[in-house]
C-alpha cells in the first residue's frame, strides 16, 4: 500500500489477539509518515467500539505509531497540560483499509503532572491465559513497558514538550488550509 501523505485522513483499527476488532477511529489526520512511523492527530474523531457504541474524542490528541516498537502513544492536549495514554500493542501494519494493530491490554497513563500508572494488569493476565499469548509475546510486551518508561523518564520522542507543540502547530496549519 502507498503511504499516506501529510493532510490525508486514515482509519485506525485496533484488534485483540484473537482477531476480534476492538475499536475503530475514523478520520485521523496524518501529520507525518516515515518508513517506520506515522504521526497523526485526532480531534473530534468518531470512535466505534466493538459492541457498536460510538463516541467522539473530546480534545485534540497527537497519535504516534511505530513499526518496530510494541506500543503506540496518544498525547492528549488538555487545558491543564498534556497527558498521555500509551497502549502496549503490536507494531502497526497499513493496508488499503486502515492502520491496524493488536491491543495487548496493558496501558501506561502519564498525567499532566508527570505521575505514571500501569493500567489493566488484571485484564492483561486474564486475556493472556484466555487468548493464549505466547511466552515470546509476554516477554516482548514486558520489555517494551521498560522502553516506554525510559522514553517517558527521558522525555524522548512524543514525551518531549517540543514534540507536542510542533505537531499540534502543524495540525492547526493544515486544518486552516
Swiss-Prot record:
Q: What is its EC number?
A: 3.6.1.15, 3.6.1.6
Enumerate the UniProt keywords alphabetically: Hydrolase, Magnesium, Metal-binding
Give the required cofactors.
Mg(2+)
The UniProt annotation places Mg(2+) 1 binding at 87, 103, 107
Q: Where on this chain does Mg(2+) 2 bind?
A: 105, 107, 120, 123
Where do the coiled-coil regions begin and end?
none
Recorded GO terms, molecular function?
magnesium ion binding; nucleoside diphosphate phosphatase activity; ribonucleoside triphosphate phosphatase activity
Q: Give the source's domain of life in one word.
A: Bacteria
Active-site residues, Swiss-Prot/TrEMBL: 23 (proton donor)
**Matching SUPFAM superfamilies:** FomD-like (SSF159234)
Q: Which reaction does it catalyse?
A: a ribonucleoside 5'-triphosphate + H2O = a ribonucleoside 5'-diphosphate + phosphate + H(+); a ribonucleoside 5'-diphosphate + H2O = a ribonucleoside 5'-phosphate + phosphate + H(+)
Which NCBIfam families does the record cross-reference, listed alphabetically? Answer: PRK13662.1 (NF010183)
**What family is this protein classified in?**
Belongs to the Ntdp family.
- In UniProt terms, what function does this protein have? Has nucleoside phosphatase activity towards nucleoside triphosphates and nucleoside diphosphates.
Question: What is the protein's name according to its record?
Answer: Nucleoside triphosphate/diphosphate phosphatase
Q: Which organism is it from?
A: Streptococcus suis (strain 05ZYH33)
